[in-house]
Amino acid sequence: MNEDTTTLVEETNTTTQAALRQLSQTTPLVNAITNDVTVNQVANIILHWGGLPVMSDDVRELDEMVNAAEACLLNMGTVSETGEEAMMTAGQAASEHDAGLVLDPVGAGATATRSRVAERLSTTLDVDVINGNRGEVAALVGEDAEVRGVESVGEHPDAAETAIACAQHTEAVVVSSGVTDIVATAETAFELNVGDEMLGTLVGTGCMLGGTIAAFCGGLDDPLTAALTGTVAFGLAGEAAANGEFGEYAGPASYETTVLDAAAGTDPEMIAAVDIDNRVNRVLAEAK
């Protein structure tokens, strides 16, 4: 692990604080092609982290829109032929205009079509960060993945090794979400113990994490730093919401609103008060 990566892990708290300050100073424009189910949540989470969301998926304007953006999110939740081509167009524009590119391969492994589209997007485009659940990440490297609909089921004991293999295959930083989150490069992986089980009661938290990472990619130069600090910030917002720090909630529906409030209210001072550094650990793993 090189010196820069060691510093990033050992100083996660201060790095996350710095990332939030950078977002507030830059207000990155993020073009998100996301699914019909979660478009509102994704737009709001981008806004609450300090970004400016725009949800264009029209191929007639995507090059122009992405040219103006600092980051682009491609979410496969409601994949279609026209949607696939829109994502290809947006992804190519992101590379041409040096915008951060985040791919959420929703449902990869569930059907042959989704697996094919995910493989095309992840290997043809110059993706900076891939954000998926355990099953989706496994599917991208050809492993048997238990994905039912768009949800990952079953056990994934080799999640870190699989994430590293995915990073090598796609040349992207990989975020593999689960009970704990894995952030991987082609050389190593890190386990993040952040978040709350209440996040699992909502449809769309993975999409919201993707929107978070896209916002951080828009405000930061380094994809690994953006993936790590974005995942930490989203997890801590989920914890703060579950702990009642942003108001009481009666169940999943009101908890979702509280998560958005927590994202809007998460600032460097709040991060400074949380012991994060011992909850981010390097996983000693080699690709399979």
From Swiss-Prot:
Its cofactor is Mg(2+). Substrate binds at M55, G204. Gene3D superfamilies: 3.40.1190.20. It holds the Pfam family HK. Its EC number is 2.7.1.50. HAMAP family: Thz_kinase (MF_00228). The gene is thiM. GO terms for molecular function: ATP binding; hydroxyethylthiazole kinase activity; magnesium ion binding. Keywords: ATP-binding, Kinase, Magnesium, Metal-binding, Nucleotide-binding, Thiamine biosynthesis, Transferase. This is Hydroxyethylthiazole kinase. ATP binds at N131, S177. Pathway: Cofactor biosynthesis; thiamine diphosphate biosynthesis; 4-methyl-5-(2-phosphoethyl)-thiazole from 5-(2-hydroxyethyl)-4-methylthiazole: step 1/1. It is an enzyme of class 2 (transferase). InterPro entries: Hyethyz_kinase, Ribokinase-like. Belongs to the Thz kinase family. Catalyzes the phosphorylation of the hydroxyl group of 4-methyl-5-beta-hydroxyethylthiazole (THZ). GO terms for biological process: thiamine biosynthetic process; thiamine diphosphate biosynthetic process. It catalyses: 5-(2-hydroxyethyl)-4-methylthiazole + ATP = 4-methyl-5-(2-phosphooxyethyl)-thiazole + ADP + H(+).
